[in-house]
Amino acid sequence: MGNATQVETDSAALMAEPRLVAETGVAARIAHIATPVLADLGYRLVRVKLSAQDGMTVQIMAERPDGAMTVNDCEAVSAALSPALDVEDVVKQAYRLEISSPGIDRPLVRVSDFRRALDQEARIELRLGLDGRKRFRGLIKGVTGAGAAAVVTLERVDAKPGEAVEAVLPLDDLAEAKLVLTEELIRAALRAAKAALAEEGEPEEQEEGGGEAAPAGKAERGPGRFTPKPAKAKSAQGKPVKAKPVLPAGVKTQFKQLKSGRLQGLAREGAPALRPTPK
């Protein structure tokens, strides 16, 4: 009983945790609309980004308090957020709505993100800078303080001869931060996925010829990147059936809505979410 109460308390604290970065202009207005909609569903906003390449795209990155985000989560967010954006009419032109998880090499937008990323490599950019320098790259070795008063200790991998290897960066000056996609980061994500499956009592699948077991339902980032693709199931009519994978935290998830209105979940990068233009 006590553990359940503590989990609920921790989850509530994470939901209420403010972001350290903020959008500007139209993206800021979208973030203002999206935040309460996401909160009502139990999700947190990570960031909003607008892209004008190949038409206007509104990219909204969200997550659960524990960092997880499945295809079904993306679908739920899209279904709730799309009408809210329609009512407010923030974007004055036709656009595509893309809902995604933060992914493995995720942005770091809250103090808790930095705490979870201890010993991982990150790129951090400050607004004003420290000793004339704005961009840093290195291993996150510690986080002290809370909120905007927190500071991050970085063991720099970009330090030149004569420069200090350790940098203490104030998060109230944070402009942007993101994890660097490394082999260690991928292994850590896979270990976390296996641990999550073990807690749920899901059996682990052993790869042929020995080696590390791959978590069931894990989405691939590319052909053969982590595990061979399973054989496609077929319906009674002989047509392939696409199953929605259940993804662990850290695996990139995206969602798109086709023009016909049929919803299709995706578990790969680079697939935009197409939002039908109201007639």
UniProtKB/Swiss-Prot annotation:
Gene3D superfamilies hit by this protein: RimP-like superfamily, N-terminal
Q: Where is this region: Disordered?
A: 197-279
Record organism:
Methylocella silvestris (strain DSM 15510 / CIP 108128 / LMG 27833 / NCIMB 13906 / BL2)
GO CC entries: cytosol
Q: Which InterPro entries match?
A: Ribosome_maturation_RimP (IPR003728), RimP_C (IPR028998), RimP_C_sf (IPR036847), RimP_N (IPR028989), RimP_N_sf (IPR035956)
* Tagged with keyword Transmembrane: no
Protein name listed in UniProt: Ribosome maturation factor RimP
Signal peptide extent: none
The taxonomy runs: Bacteria, Pseudomonadati, Pseudomonadota, Alphaproteobacteria, Hyphomicrobiales
Spell out the family assignment given in the record's similarity comment: Belongs to the RimP family.
**Biological function:** Required for maturation of 30S ribosomal subunits.
Location within or outside the cell: Cytoplasm
Q: Which UniProt keywords apply?
A: Cytoplasm, Ribosome biogenesis
One biological-process term from Gene Ontology? ribosomal small subunit assembly
Q: Where is the composition biased (Acidic residues)?
A: 199-210
